Amino acid sequence: MTEPLKPRIDFDGPLEVDQNPKFRAQQTFDENQAQNFAPATLDEAPEEEGQVEAVMDAALRPKRSLWRKMVMGGLALFGASVVGQGVQWTMNAWQTQDWVALGGCAAGALIIGAGVGSVVTEWRRLWRLRQRAHERDEARDLLHSHGTGKGRAFCEKLAQQAGIDQSHPALQRWYASIHETQNDREVVSLYAHLVQPVLDAQARREICRSAAESTLMIAVSPLALVDMAFIAWRNLRLINRIATLYGIELGYYSRLRLFKLVLLNIAFAGASELVREVGMDWMSQDLAARLSTRAAQGIGAGLLTARLGIKAMELCRPLPWIDDDKPRLGDFRRQLIGQVKETLQKGKTPSEK
């Protein structure tokens, strides 16, 4: 049997017309533009840094302002006046044979000499910290360079600054992997993948250790003053150790720039301590809730310490981050939570027995 024909269907709207896609006009690049071409990354989510990250940048990065130049000029003029007055006093004491005043002038000269030596030493350390930023820019240029001859000397200088011996296995592997036909980009990339991770691993261990100690100390300490002093000491020590690992010796002025961030960390610990004490007394929570609050407070302080260590590691490191090898705060967070849980479980086990 044949199926009956379906009735006709009339549509009111017009038929859709195929729309041809519109393309932009062709653009031709010359040879120089083609070599420097880099694809743009669209909708790239920026890493969440927060206000603490901005404070770190402001603390670790050297600042120059008109007021600072005026203060430095005034100090230099005052120092010159002190030296001139000291010379005049010395001449008068010698002419009048005032030996007591002459001894005082000699003691003052020794003190001034020690002060000048300290200023020169601090300036040299500050200059070394600024040179590290220039070395990082140079490494970034070499990672995009197709020339030859500069990469090996640059990497050998970095290894010498970091105190890596020529017989180190990582450095020997790097020497065995490079040859004369490789350009600067390949040589520096090999150094970044073979030698630099040795120092990065040591810095990560220092960050983990300091963050864990800060977390556990705050989680078990009942005194806010002890927490604040402990965090200050641990953070300053962490910065010094990371800088030493990368071949940088921090001076007094460099520590002053970092002290603002340390104060932020201390303020966090002290404020959270006050909130915990007032909240617990007001709400009359049990011991378990008190331990949970202390653990959360300790983890927060430990994460701030880890964030400080990551930023110090980034600014003391001679090479830029490549291939997403930058340490993430989430890695330290998981480790800190695991350590706090383990510590609390060990503390509950004897009490239950």
Swiss-Prot record:
Q: What is the first-listed, main subcellular location in coarse terms?
A: membrane
Which Gene Ontology terms of cellular component type are present?
Answer: plasma membrane
Q: Where in the cell is it found?
A: Cell inner membrane
Q: Which residues cross the membrane?
A: 70-90, 100-120, 213-233
Entry-linked InterPro entries: DUF697, UPF0283
Q: Which of UniProt's keywords are assigned here?
A: Cell inner membrane, Cell membrane, Membrane, Transmembrane, Transmembrane helix
How is this protein positioned relative to the membrane?
Multi-pass membrane protein
Does Membrane show up as a keyword for this record?
yes
Query: One matching Pfam family, short form?
Result: DUF697
Q: Does the keyword Transcription apply?
A: no
What family is reported?
Belongs to the UPF0283 family.
Q: Which HAMAP family match?
A: UPF0283
Q: What is this protein called?
A: UPF0283 membrane protein YcjF
Q: Which organism is it from?
A: Shigella boydii serotype 4 (strain Sb227)
